Curated annotation (Swiss-Prot):
CDD domains: AAA (cd00009), Bac_DnaA_C (cd06571). Oligomerizes as a right-handed, spiral filament on DNA at oriC. Keywords: ATP-binding, Cytoplasm, DNA replication, DNA-binding, Lipid-binding, Nucleotide-binding. Residues 1-74 are annotated as: Domain I, interacts with DnaA modulators. This is Chromosomal replication initiator protein DnaA. ATP binds at G184, G186, K187, T188. Residues 357-484 are annotated as: Domain IV, binds dsDNA. It comes from Borrelia garinii subsp. bavariensis (strain ATCC BAA-2496 / DSM 23469 / PBi) (Borreliella bavariensis).
Amino acid sequence: MEKSKNIWSLILTEIKKELSEEEFYVWFENLCFLESIGDNIQISTPNLFHKNQIEKRFTKKIKEILTKNGYNNVTIVFTNQPPKTYSSKQESEKTTFKETLQNFDKLKGNTLSKEPIQSIKDRIKMYIKEEEPTNFKNPFLKKRYTFENFIIGPNNRLAYNASLSISKNPGKKYNPCLIYGGVGLGKTHLLQSIGNKTEELHNNLKILYVTAENFLNEFVESIKTHETKKFKKKYRYLDMLLIDDIHDLQKKEGIQEELFHTFNALYEDNKQLVFTCDRSPSELTNFTDRLKSRFTRGLNVDISKPNFELRVAIIEKKAEEDGIKVPKDILNLVAQKVTTNVRDLEAAVTKLKAYIDLDNIEIDIDIVEKIIKEIIIYEKETTNESSNKINIENIKKILLRELKIAHKDIEGHSKKPEITKARHIYAYLLRNFTELSTVEIGKIIGGKTHSTVLYSINKIDRDRNNDKEINNLITELMNKIKKN
């Protein structure tokens, strides 16, 4: 029996030399030495799929190892029969993966075998000697982003509380966490604050903040320079990974595949993952389903546009930081007119400061109106999906005219094919030309549910790829909406 165990230990050792750490861990960690009957050594696998994959991938290699070491008559038999069904004698002879590694250490006279094994990964690292990254730096964390200077309101309170909790106890709960919402609402501020606060409270942890674009560029560069192993090592040895604007990875299957494996490696090791996105995971298109499912494993929390009271607080805070005094009526006017996001509110205060500092004039209503107009015009010019840019009524008007559909039908419950098709297109156009959520779009299209709207959007997206006529129709409609 002891000889058979040593043979199995030998096989594991030889295979370890040829596999990556991740592959070895995936395929062999859950195997269990059961017994030997004559020249047959029985190894238990966790399920039938695992058994079939092990046999398919490693039978040839195992035979080579046995032959090379003079065990020509020995056969390794894999079974998916649960260990508990074996007799008490066989149960006592069963050897787990950890025990097999310990046995091999003893066989070699390795003194490390006397120490307790903390984890399978730790043991694997003893055989696959890879150095962890040294001199770890986090160049993209900006110290100006803190929880202390984040303005809290009903639109972002849950996201704030979750972010603070993550900083205090990374990897314990809310893992992964995805914060989503429109442009300029504070997602980056919270993500950076998580990194800064965690660094302050847990200075021994390796924390990395990166934008999705930088993550992509770094991956592409690693392929060009044949340093993908270095790239993987950098990201899979982290204690906390913070990726901003994950939606920028849409339609990029290669980097999505890499992110999927990085996600798994960190998640299985209880390392914290936090992402930001401009929409909820269910609304992401051109993203692999398995990656979207990873995002929904933990907490998904949204940040909506600030209400009037919060807008006032944001302006007051920015004015205080910039050292200017804003009269109450001016402050309220800016808060009433600039309703888009935090970024635009702060831009308004910055412009006010410029007038005061450079022109040395007193701020009045006319100047404020001019500043607000500049901000709104800029928002229209730079935000392709802004709800200010294209009026919802114009979208509907063009759609009804071009498809020859009655107003009552598009928002009604008719199931005629041409009406249903028009509703699908309406939902798709609203999603592409406005910042409305699927719930808000559903209310516009006759009280449809989130899932119904999402189905419509995805259907048109698929049809455009597969049906030239549909694609031409949508393109024509979109061009007319833009020109209108």
